[in-house]
């Protein structure tokens, strides 16, 4: 039944295979509109029965919607098939360039005659919706759901043209230019096929996609837009069959343009070959799909890695364990006496036998053995209070039954470490302590030397501590009362004891008894710059015998000093920097106290020390070092002073002359090596070689004077000649050094220069 005079038996897409060419004329709504709608009387509804021909009460309840719908659907399909068979090749295909797409005015009127396909017009007539002014309660039609991939492509393609609004003349000119413009040579020719085949191919390709994409594509191609030519709509509708679904993406990350299928475009009024989407747009869409898939894969892999890392630590602590630790921490923060709330302290108290009060016991149970909030469904959970009480009972009983370790069982053991478990979280270390002082004294007496530099530094620090303690006790003398003799005696006894401790810490006796193969401990101490500074502070408080003992240790082990072993110049005339620093410290802190001792010795002692120095060292090597020359000069000068004083007997003089002759004969022919090499400019003007030669010239005979002059002649003349060209300060130093040697033999530098 038709209320508005339309033929409802005609199929909706009857004219679609026939390219929309209707045999009858188009319908012009402007001519047929007779303004009858304004004459309707909508005041009352009492004539509804006469208008619709039936009454509301006569409507039955026996509806058969499925049967009627099935019959109508089958009839429509048969009619559609017959019409398609009759009109497949009824009319030739007209070129699309002869048709102009209809452009709507802004007010809804048409500029050109309508060339819309008949199927579209019939669809519009069949799908007319009642106006909202007549039917007020019409539910608005929901827009078609467009997949996000198609929507993103439409937005990119349509974003730029939509920014500018064209006028009617500009749109017409643009459409005419696009249809008449020549096709670029690089564009492949698009095959022209009948519209029936194109439509069939389009439906098949669209139906192979997802329902959402196919529905959106069909709506965009056929029914979605009016006659306004929209490039975005055409591209979206035509590119939809060639789109690759994300679930069907090929695994090859490089997209090949040649693999994209070429789809023929129908040559009807809505499609134009000149505006067909190029292959670059399809490739752009496929690249976007590939990037999205890669991003999804990266996110998925990152999520899997995070889950794997978290799974490694999963299950280490239960919720009950976490709450148990939280209760312990909170109880320690809130308690005024954290020690009494400590778990280990409570266990220790229980083992010791101290019984806690009821209040402390209740607080302990509430803190550590409280009920857990972790409820296990379907399983019986153990009571932690009972479990821990049993563990405590076993711990106490085992501690009482365990026999106490005796001293015999700990013999020869460095320590005993308990197994670190939950029940014994702390390690127990039982170290044997020395109880016999005799063993320590015997080990001290058998001490032969330090093994590492750390031991040497530790010994130096120990001596400093004892020395500071001794000096502190020495300063207490000002507070003593001179009348209290007992207090003075106690103070002297304390000083002597402290001084004896310092003497033992220096290992002087062990150094005297040390063999030549090992380095004495005292030599190791004074070889360090910090140990050298000890001697000037300690020497005034030592006795003369102790001072001579220190001198003997230095002389007997002179070749063990680093400044002697490494004190010779290399081929470049240089010395190591650390050796230079140690030589400076030795000259500043060691030689002055020893010089004080030497100046108080007799000739016999000097003779013995000088003989020991020559016997224990290599004299030729010794004269090439600064410290060696200084010690030789020290002993020779003291012996000559004693010999010329007239206080020594003839035997001592002869003994000294024999000892000096032994030294002179050993270094004979090597006196020129006492000077630094010519390339050692920093040491060229030092006076220690000339002091040694002057001491030797004083003790030498006439024949020995000739040997000294002949071996040192070149260096003497060189100093005299270069002093004439050198600055006045340097010239004075060089002339004075030469005169120091020549004056000992009764000569002068002015005689040689003349």
UniProtKB/Swiss-Prot annotation:
GO terms for biological process: deadenylation-dependent decapping of nuclear-transcribed mRNA; mRNA processing; P-body assembly; regulation of translation. It is found in: Cytoplasm; Nucleus; Cytoplasm, P-body. GO terms for cellular component: cytoplasm; cytosol; nucleus; P-body. Keywords: Cytoplasm, mRNA processing, Nucleus, Repressor, RNA-binding, Translation regulation. Residues 499-754 are annotated as: Interaction with lsm1. It holds the Pfam family PAT1. Its main location: cytoplasm. One of its GO terms (molecular function) is RNA binding. Interacts with dcp2. Interacts with lsm1; via C-terminus. Activator of decapping that functions as a general and active mechanism of translational repression and required for P-body formation. Stabilizes the 3' terminus of mRNAs and modulates the rates of mRNA-decapping that occur following deadenylation. Might be required for promoting the formation or the stabilization of the preinitiation translation complexes. Necessary for accurate chromosome transmission during cell division. Together with lsm1, recruits the deadenylase ccr4 to P-bodies. Belongs to the PAT1 family. This is Deadenylation-dependent mRNA-decapping factor pdc2. It comes from Schizosaccharomyces pombe (strain 972 / ATCC 24843) (Fission yeast). The lineage of its organism: Eukaryota, Fungi, Dikarya, Ascomycota, Taphrinomycotina.
């Amino acid at each position: 039944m038709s209320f508005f005079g339309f033929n409802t038996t005609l199929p909706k897409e009857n004219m679609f295979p026939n390219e929309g060419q209707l045999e009858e004329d188009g319908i012009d709504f402007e001519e047929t509109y007779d303004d009858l709608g304004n004459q309707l009387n909508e005041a009352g509804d009492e004539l509804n029965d006469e208008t619709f021909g039936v009454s509301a009460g006569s409507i039955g309840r026996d509806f058969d919607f499925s049967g009627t719908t099935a019959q109508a659907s089958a009839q429509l399909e048969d009619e559609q098939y017959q019409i398609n068979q009759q009109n497949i090749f009824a009319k030739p295909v007209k070129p699309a360039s002869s048709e102009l797409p209809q452009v709507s005015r802004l007010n809804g009127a048409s500029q050109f005659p309508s060339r819309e396909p008949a199927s579209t017009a019939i669809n519009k007539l069949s799908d007319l919706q009642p106006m909202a002014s007549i039917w007020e309660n019409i539910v608005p039609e929901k827009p078609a759901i467009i997949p996000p991939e198609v929507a993103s492509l439409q937005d990119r393609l349509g974003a730029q043209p939509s920014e500018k609004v064209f006028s009617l003349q500009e749109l017409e000119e643009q459409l005419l230019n696009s249809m008449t413009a020549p096709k670029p040579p690089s564009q492949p020719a698009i095959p022209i096929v009948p519209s029936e085949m194109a439509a069939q191919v389009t439906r098949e390709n669209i139906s192979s996609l997802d329902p959402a994409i196919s529905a959106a594509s069909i709506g965009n191609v056929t029914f979605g837009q009016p006659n306004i030519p929209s490039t975005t709509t055409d591209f979206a509708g035509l590119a939809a069959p060639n789109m690759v679904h994300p679930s069907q993406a090929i695994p090859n990350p490089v997209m090949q343009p040649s693999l994209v299928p070429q789809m023929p475009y129908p040559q009807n009024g809505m499609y134009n070959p000149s505006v067909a989407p190029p292959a670059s747009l399809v490739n752009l869409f496929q690249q976007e799909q590939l990037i999205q898939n890669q991003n999804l894969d990266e996110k998925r892999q990152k999520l899997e890695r995070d889950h794997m890392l978290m799974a490694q630590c999963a299950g280490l602590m239960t919720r009950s364990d976490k709450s148990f630790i939280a209760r312990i921490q909170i109880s320690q923060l809130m308690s005024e006496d954290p020690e009494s709330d400590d778990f280990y302290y409570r266990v220790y108290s229980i083992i010791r036998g101290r019984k806690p009060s009821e209040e402390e016991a209740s607080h302990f149970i509430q803190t550590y053995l409280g009920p857990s909030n972790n409820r296990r469904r379907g399983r019986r959970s153990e009571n932690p209070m009972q479990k821990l009480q049993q563990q405590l009972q076993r711990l106490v009983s085992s501690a009482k039954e365990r026999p106490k370790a005796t001293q015999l069982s700990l013999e020869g053991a460095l320590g005993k470490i308990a197994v670190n478990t939950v029940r014994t979280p702390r390690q127990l270390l039982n170290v044997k302590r020395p109880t016999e002082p005799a063993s320590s004294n015997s080990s001290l007496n058998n001490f032969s030397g330090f093994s590492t530099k750390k031991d040497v530094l530790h010994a130096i620090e120990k001596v400093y501590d004892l020395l500071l303690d001794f000096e502190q006790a020495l300063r207490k003398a000002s507070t003593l009362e001179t009348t209290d003799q007992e207090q003075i005696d106690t103070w002297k006894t304390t000083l002597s004891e402290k001084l004896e401790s310092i003497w033992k810490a220096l290992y002087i006796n062990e150094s005297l008894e040390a063999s030549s193969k090992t380095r004495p401990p005292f030599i190791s101490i004074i070889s360090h710059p910090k140990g050298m500074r000890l001697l000037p502070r300690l020497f005034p408080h030592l006795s003369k015998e102790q001072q001579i003992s220190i001198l003997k240790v230095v002389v007997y082990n002179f070749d063990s000093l680093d400044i002697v072993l490494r004190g010779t110049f290399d081929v470049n005339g240089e010395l190591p920097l650390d050796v230079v620093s140690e030589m400076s410290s030795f000259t500043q802190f060691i030689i002055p106290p020893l010089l004080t001792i030497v100046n108080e010795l007799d000739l016999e002692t000097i003779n013995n020390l000088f003989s020991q120095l020559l016997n224990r060292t290599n004299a030729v090597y010794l004269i090439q070092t600064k410290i060696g020359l200084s010690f030789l000069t020290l002993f020779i000068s003291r012996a000559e002073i004693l010999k010329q004083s007239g206080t020594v007997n003839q035997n001592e003089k002869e003994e000294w002359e024999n000892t000096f002759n032994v030294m002179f004969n050993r270094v004979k022919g090597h006196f020129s090596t006492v000077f630094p090499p010519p390339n050692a400019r920093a040491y060229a003007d030092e006076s220690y070689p000339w002091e040694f030669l002057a001491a030797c010239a004083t003790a030498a005979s006439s024949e020995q004077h000739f040997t000294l002059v002949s071996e040192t002649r070149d260096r003497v003349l060189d100093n005299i000649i270069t002093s004439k060209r050198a600055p006045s300060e340097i010239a004075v130093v060089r002339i004075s050094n030469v005169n120091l040697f020549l004056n000992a033999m009764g000569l002068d530098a002015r005689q040689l220069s003349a």
